[in-house]
């Protein structure tokens, strides 16, 4: 299979990383053109704002330069909803589904692309995974929309309430963070139905499809794969730490939790603890948060959620591998062991490569925005981390960005969605060498 795969790669004009990058780019362009149509907007929309909105939706980020609820018509909002769905599940998923509907055979080249898009270790079973993934996603979005409609239909009426329910269900499951309301979800800060449904959706979408299918298949923690164990325990621990941190730091802040009842404080702390790694919805004003909370949120946005999910960031498992490897080194151990499993050296190197490349991209983004924007440094840093993690949280800078600033954020969102290594591999040529050079000594630390 390896030999056959190498032959196919040589035959294909573009490598899988290049196809993924080009596919996302073309989706963004088509989306921008659709959003500029008169039928899509209530008032004229500039090309850069259309491009930014399409990029934000396709990369499932959620940063917005215009108000989604008032700037766009139902048609325009439906286009955004479609871009979110394509961006969340991956355009290759929809391409394969279309080929299957047309009754055509899916070749090895297409299977390789799906493998790359879904970040799967092997090529076997990827088409079956696409079918299950699509049906599972649509089912959970429709069920969630029905539950949300119980709360929203009485408030907005049948047509608007049902549409808002579907829009927010799709936006949440795909970790987009787009909302039809100017204050996002701040009006529902203490609403149990909205809080539970929305967080369930973006945690489910962000934990990764591989983990979900593993849990549904095996059901017992002992039989889960190492990846699933890391994701479940890491998610629970990080969410608990984040909730406690937000609750303590913002408890007396009059701009966030200070004016809320204790129950609403807990709901808001929970919501804002889990949203930075995935979705980008907010029930509190991030522009009013204390600097300590903002800095902690930067870490959460950079970590992100799970591999093979609708979220971005360096991924939680990457963070865990690096952290445990450092701890193992400091304790004088030669191996990194997690849950009685040794982590292979190439995995550790890949985790380091992802992290260092990501930090470099974020640094370049911050550097560029400090040149183009006249804004407080912390706002620039926050917006850059949010764009790279495709989170969508903002301290209020995004609507005020210059044209150059919007272009920079678009590029960062794009790289964050396809992944830093995929982006680099789409340009770089990988060469294997059989030459073994002698070891050299380098002083570090």
From Swiss-Prot:
GO terms for biological process: potassium ion transmembrane transport. Pfam families: TrkH. It comes from Bacillus subtilis (strain 168). The keyword Transit peptide does not apply. This is Ktr system potassium uptake protein B. Integral membrane subunit of the KtrAB potassium uptake transporter. The 2 major potassium transporter complexes KtrAB and KtrCD confer resistance to both suddenly imposed and prolonged osmotic stress. Belongs to the TrkH potassium transport family. Ktr (TC 2.A.38.4) subfamily. Keywords: Cell membrane, Ion transport, Membrane, Potassium, Potassium transport, Transmembrane, Transmembrane helix, Transport. The chain crosses the membrane at residues 19-39, 46-66, 79-99, 127-147, 161-181, 196-216, 230-250, 286-306, 313-333, 351-371, 377-397, 408-428. Disruption phenotype: Impaired potassium uptake. The gene is ktrB. GO terms for molecular function: potassium ion transmembrane transporter activity; potassium:chloride symporter activity. It is found in: Cell membrane. Homodimer. Part of the KtrAB complex formed by an octameric catalytic ring of KtrA and a membrane associated dimer of KtrB forming a potassium channel. Coiled coil: none annotated. It is a multi-pass membrane protein. GO terms for cellular component: plasma membrane. The keyword rRNA-binding does not apply. The lineage of its organism: Bacteria, Bacillati, Bacillota, Bacilli, Bacillales. InterPro entries: Cat_transpt, TrkH.
């Amino acid at each position: 299979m390896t030999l056959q795969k190498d032959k196919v790669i040589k035959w294909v004009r573009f490598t899988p990383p290049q196809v993924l990058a080009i596919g996302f780019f073309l989706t963004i362009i088509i989306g921008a053109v659709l959003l500029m149509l008169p039928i899509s907007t209530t008032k004229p929309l500039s090309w850069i704002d259309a491009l930014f909105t399409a990029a934000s939706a396709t990369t499932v980020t959620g940063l917005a330069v215009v108000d989604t609820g008032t700037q766009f018509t139902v048609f325009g909002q439906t286009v955004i909803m479609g871009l979110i769905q394509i961006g969340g599940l991956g355009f290759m998923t929809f391409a394969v589904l279309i080929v299957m509907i047309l009754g055509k055979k899916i070749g090895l080249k297409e299977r390789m692309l799906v493998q790359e898009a879904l970040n799967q270790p092997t090529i076997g079973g990827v088409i079956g995974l696409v079918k299950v993934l699509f049906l599972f996603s649509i089912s959970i979005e429709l069920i969630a929309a029905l539950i949300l409609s119980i709360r929203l239909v009485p408030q907005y009426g049948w047509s608007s309430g049902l549409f808002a329910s579907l829009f927010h269900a799709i936006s949440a499951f795909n970790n987009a963070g787009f909302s039809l309301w100017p204050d996002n979800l701040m009006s529902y800060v203490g609403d149990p139905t909205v809080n539970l449904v929305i967080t369930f959706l973006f945690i489910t979408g962000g934990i990764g499809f591989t983990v979900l299918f593993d849990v549904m298949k095996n059901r017992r923690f002992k039989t889960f794969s190492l990846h699933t164990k890391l994701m479940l325990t890491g998610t629970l621990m990080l969410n608990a730490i984040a909730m406690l941190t937000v609750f303590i730091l913002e408890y007396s802040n009059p701009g966030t939790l200070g004016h809320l009842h204790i129950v609403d404080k807990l709901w808001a702390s929970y919501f804002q603890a889990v949203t930075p790694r995935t979705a980008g919805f907010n029930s509190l004003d991030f522009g009013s948060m204390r600097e300590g909370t903002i800095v902690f949120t930067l870490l959460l946005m950079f970590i992100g959620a799970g591999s093979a999910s609708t979220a971005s960031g360096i991924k939680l498992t990457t963070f865990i591998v690096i952290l445990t490897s450092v701890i193992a080194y400091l304790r004088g151990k030669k191996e990194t062991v997690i849950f009685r499993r040794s982590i292979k050296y190439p995995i550790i190197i890949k985790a380091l490569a992802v992290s260092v490349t990501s930090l470099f991209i974020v640094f370049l983004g911050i550097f560029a925005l400090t040149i183009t924007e006249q804004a407080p440094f912390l706002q620039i840093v926050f917006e850059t981390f949010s764009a790279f993690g495709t989170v969508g949280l903002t301290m209020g800078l995004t609507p005020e960005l210059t044209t150059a600033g919007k272009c920079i954020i678009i590029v960062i969102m794009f790289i964050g969605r396809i992944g830093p290594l995929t982006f680099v591999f789409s340009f770089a040529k990988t060469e294997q060498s059989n030459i073994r050079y002698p070891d050299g000594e380098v002083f570090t630390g």
